[in-house]
Amino acid sequence: MKWHFGAKQVGAKQVDAKKVGARKVLSVVMATAVAMSPAMAGPALLFDAANGRVLYAEDQDDQWHPASLTKIITAYLVFEAVRDGKISLQDKIKVSELAHSQPPSHLGLPVGAEISVDAALQALIIKSANDAAVMLAEAVAGSQEAFVERMNAAAKRLGMTRSYFVNANGLPAPEQVSTARDLARLTIAVVRDFPNYTHYWAMEEMRLGKRVLRNHNPLLRSYDGTDGMKTGFICDSGYNLVASASRDGRKLVAVVLGETTGGNRSARAANLLEHGFQTQGWKTLFGAESLDTMPLAADAKSVVSIRQSVISWACGTGRRRAVARAKNRKRNVAAAAKSKAGQAAKKAPATTQ
């Protein structure tokens, strides 16, 4: 189901997926309502972070694999533990066997190595490090299992009624699900409850020893006003993103789930944000619908995998396409050689015996 409040053309162009990763800040204005683009894939939501007012919603209650967007609630619980004095940002935490066993994206530190809670939080958000998520979970709750119980309790407390978590980092698990609306509620809670930690979400890079780790969110380097939040990707979910941006005292947040490429993910989020910033008079045009008052979609779907649509070497589609291109090139070369041989035969002088 698609909700688009006060749809109105404001004159300019959409963000190009190929340009969204450029280092220069983009000055783009969106011409047509984002709702009109048939190529857009999964659920999406655009809302005001101050009051939860919805500017655009599409399939907002469909369950989706959150992938590394899971790390937003992981960070939320770590912030809570720091606030409550249970741990400090300066505390050293160790790499356990479980943390060390986590697949990329990860820091890859050896078992027994230590880093601060602060560094682990940076790695969680910037690098999207799966091992850092487990380290933090163990530091806060003693084990990942106990931490997951806290995640689900927090989700219930925050009104994330269609979300369920089984791990702290978002690695593939059939039962790990959320929705665009639930992730929006989580984002509002993070911004509201921990304004002193907003710098974590806005950091473009971090240093760990001699390594420089860059943020996976290209909008931080390409879209004017971007100040967070988090990317996510597994093959079954496609490319996910929660992106926040602030201009002229307004903070808008876009939730994008299930794009087939990273570029499309960034472009869709940028277009949604630009739509929100460029549409004038939105407070009166869009009515009073908010995350809490917008009705639950009657046709809300359970989670599905979009693996076959995702363009990524990790999911096999990139490899299959590369093989197909190689076969096409081989056929083209063979056809060209055959054609050249045929032309040469026609030009050859006739001979008699």
Task: Describe the predicted segments one by one.
Residues 160-164, 172-177, 181-353:
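Domain-terminus/edge residues, biased toward the C-terminal soluble/receptor-binding domains
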Residues 2, 31-181, 188-191:
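Active-site-adjacent loops and short helices of periplasmic peptidoglycan-processing enzymes
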Residues 23-28:
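Sec-dependent signal peptide recognition
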